[in-house]
Regions:
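Positively charged n-region of N-terminal signal peptides that target proteins for export
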Residues: 1-4
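Bacterial N-terminal signal peptides
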Residues: 7-16
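A short, N-terminal "cap"/entry segment at the start of jelly-roll beta-barrel domains
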Residues: 20-90, 182-280, 378-382, 389-391, ...
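Fold-core signature of tandem repeat domains
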Residues: 62-64, 69-71, 104, 144, ...
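A short beta-loop-beta micro-motif enriched in histidine and acidic residues
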Residues: 65, 80-93, 106, 112-122, ...
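Short, conserved beta-strand element in jelly-roll/cupin
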Residues: 89-104, 108, 119-131, 282-297, ...
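Conserved metal-binding segment of the jelly-roll/cupin
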Residues: 142-163, 335-356
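A short hydrophobic beta-strand segment most commonly corresponding to one strand
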Residues: 165-181, 358-374
Length: 402
């Protein structure tokens, strides 16, 4: 029986033992703030990429307790020939395609591996130690277009076989070994004052300081496949959310070695007064990438009037694990969200929508280092979409088992 179906049976009260949620957990990130990255900042990196022939840039990297999370933006120009294969030993990635079209090949069985030197900026500040390679044996190819999502576990090769139109995508990186440094908002602003390009002398000097990153590391996900979630599938969840008054739906949840990663779709309707409850998740961190709409989101770790969420809730069982509701956030910080903005919410950090102008829809990426939530495969998702979603969704008309 698949893990996702086990979770569904437990939710329905059938005799499945899922005792992990009943424990008293402490947040894995103690008193951590949330992080907001506006679309304007992302666009500034894209503009620099086009001007200075840069492919991959880290915009921010934050500590969420059991992992660092990187948020970057990637720009690749149209090309007819395959790029070299890339593989990262310790850092996993999620792509959310913003524009353009390309064919991406994924697979763990690499041919002609060659160690990436620490003099490469990507090794030092973006995706850590790894290899280049000539090709991927028995790789699977996917045609990417705007709205698609790709999950690439550490150790899995990835190669753009062709790029039909210039492609740009949001990059989310998972770094449980914390091998890549954090990058603050102030450091991002300082970075944008420069060209973003290292001279050969600068690269050699930095490579000498971080020579250990050129060493061999065992991939943290051994022979793991990549995962592709097409925009059409995500839009099917959006359509169902609107039709059935659902809020939070898990589209996929996969094992990437050191953690599980969930990809979800959240749609919230108009809100004229603050939500009644602040949400907080003890073990699962979240990243939002706003697809459409506008809203005001309040973030902060100091919660007032906490009440434990019961394990019977679909959100606890299937979406974001154990945690609390609360009446308010003491000294919270509010952000105005618009399409293209990114938010990171560490485990233990409260979050509350205080206003939604018409609606807000966002891609949800969940980071589950304790693997407390069930996996959800493509076939699980297809089966779920044949239902009305009320048994598996959180919030709205989703499951509220007493």
């Amino acid at each position: 029986m698949r893990p996702f179906l086990l979770g569904m049976l437990a939710l329905a009260g059938i005799g499945v033992v899922v005792g992990a949620q009943a424990r008293d957990y402490q947040p894995t990130c103690r008193m951590c703030p949330g992080t907001f990255i506006g679309k304007a900042e992302m666009d500034a990196y894209l503009k620099r990429a086009m001007a200075n022939d840069i492919t991959d840039q880290q915009v921010r990297a934050v500590d969420i307790g059991k992992s660092h999370i990187g948020v970057g933006v990637v720009y690749r120009e149209k090309q007819a020939t395959p790029e070299a294969v890339a593989e990262h030993d310790l850092v996993s990635e999620v792509y959310h395609i913003m524009q353009g079209r390309a064919t991406l090949t994924l697979g763990p069985d690499l041919v002609g591996k060659q160690r990436r030197p620490a003099s490469q900026k990507t090794v030092r500040v973006q995706n850590g130690p790894g290899n280049g390679a000539r090709s991927i044996t028995n790789g699977l190819s996917y045609d990417l277009s705007p709205g698609d999502v790709v999950v690439i576990p550490a150790g899995t090769g990835h190669q753009f076989a062709k790029i039909d139109e210039d492609i740009s995508y949001l990059m989310i990186r998972f770094d449980p070994d914390k091998i890549v440094p954090v990058k603050t908002e102030a450091e991002s602003k300082a970075d944008l004052l420069g060209s973003g390009v290292e001279t050969p002398d600068e690269a050699r000097a930095a490579g000498a300081r971080y020579a250990h990153l050129g060493n061999e590391y065992a991939p943290s996900c051994q022979m793991c496949p990549g995962y592709y979630v097409p925009r059409s599938e995500i839009e099917a969840y959006t359509k169902r959310a609107i039709a059935n008054q659902l809020i939070d739906q898990q589209v996929r949840a996969v094992n990437i070695g050191r953690m599980n990663v969930g990809v979800g779709l959240v749609h919230r309707g108009r809100l004229t007064a603050p939500e009644a409850n602040v949400a907080e998740h003890d073990l699962v961190s979240e990243i939002y990438h706003v697809i459409s709409g506008q809203a005001t989101l309040n973030l902060g770790p100091d919660l007032v009037g906490k009440v434990r969420r019961p394990e019977t809730m679909a959100t606890v069982r299937l979406l974001n694990g154990p945690g609390n509701g609360a009446t308010s956030i003491r000294n919270g910080v509010s952000y105005e969200l618009n399409a293209g903005d990114v938010v990171t919410i560490p485990a233990g950090t409260g979050h509350q929508f205080t206003k939604i102008d018409d609606h807000i829809t966002y891609l949800m990426v969940r980071v589950d280092p304790d693997k407390v939530l069930p996996l959800k495969s493509a076939s699980d998702s297809a089966a779920d979409l044949k239902t009305d979603g009320r048994a598996s969704a959180g919030g709205g008309a989703g499951s509220r088992v007493p």
